Amino acid sequence: ATMLFAPYLIFAWLNSRIWTKKHPEDSQILKIENTTIFLGRIPTRSTTQKYQAVFDCVAELPVNSKNSYFQYSSLDLIPLQADQLQRAVEVFNQLMAAASSQSTQQHVLIYCALGYSRSSAILCAWLMQQQHATQVNEAIQIVQSARPWVRLNDVQIKNLNTYQLKLKGSAS
């Protein structure tokens, strides 16, 4: 199967590198007690070694990680709906619980192919769920202050607003 998909996998990997050429670094978003959250693009194997845990938002490119690995698969260019954001946040909370239970400093990487959109939307939803932000624009500002090239589109922002209403019990 790997041979069959090799051309696609190579193209997708190269595409992620071309789009992120100007911003290859991961960005530190937030530090909570012994856990620091970073946001970035799909990592190389050597990059994953800098982290004790990784959260993979990429459905189209596999990553081989020896670290604590959690995944919420989503496709590029398909905005996550509010229910999908909720499920992704639940999985991210599992990772954060595992990381915070450790006695040593934990570095956590949340990523998508480019580190611009899918992972950013999930992180914004998590920031609101954990009450680090009370509004969508505040969550986006937290992320963009560390990673200014992040851009969520109108549909993603709308879905984050719906997710926020669900958090408050105002949406079905």
Listing of model-derived features with the role each one plays in the protein:
Residues Y116-A121:
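Glycine-rich nucleophile elbow surrounding the catalytic serine of serine-hydrolase chemistry
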